Amino acid sequence: MADSSFDVVSKVDRQEVDNALHQAAKELTTRFDFRNTGASIEWSGEETITLNADTEERLLAALDVFKEKLIRRDISLKAFDAGEPAQSGKIYKLSGTLVQGISSENAKKITKKIRDEGPKGVKAQIQGEELRVSSKKRDDLQGVISLLKGEDFGIALQFVNYR
């Protein structure tokens, strides 16, 4: 019998992020406490989202609105890395990036965790920005999934291609 396997990836559905961004932008224009504060949210590039507001408090409130919309769309907040608010003239700006892909150091941490605490006979291979986990037994793979879900690696993990 062939080995069973699955892939560990860290990807974000760009369309869902776009929907969350548009919902947040609409809420910023219609909510009473954001009137005349210059609060806005927009894409600036492929992976970067920029928030603007007149005061730092309104900027952080706009960030909370955006995070709430991400949560409602089932997007992990670990996938959005918000920077620090910076003042640019009279306007406060905050740039955040979408975190996609598993970095090499995180991949090494995950493989070490699987090797040390996972069931025997489970192999983990780094393949670019994803990780392939394989074993003869499917039960071992499910044990690895629950092991990885219980650990915090600082990134949003998804488990795909379960065969």
UniProtKB/Swiss-Prot annotation:
Keywords: Nucleotide-binding. SUPFAM superfamilies: YajQ-like. CDD domains: YajQ_like. Coiled coil: none annotated. The keyword Nucleotide-binding applies. The keyword Disulfide bond does not apply. PANTHER family: UPF0234 PROTEIN YAJQ (PTHR30476:SF0). Nucleotide-binding protein. This is Nucleotide-binding protein RER_17110. It comes from Rhodococcus erythropolis (strain PR4 / NBRC 100887). The lineage of its organism: Bacteria, Bacillati, Actinomycetota, Actinomycetes, Mycobacteriales.
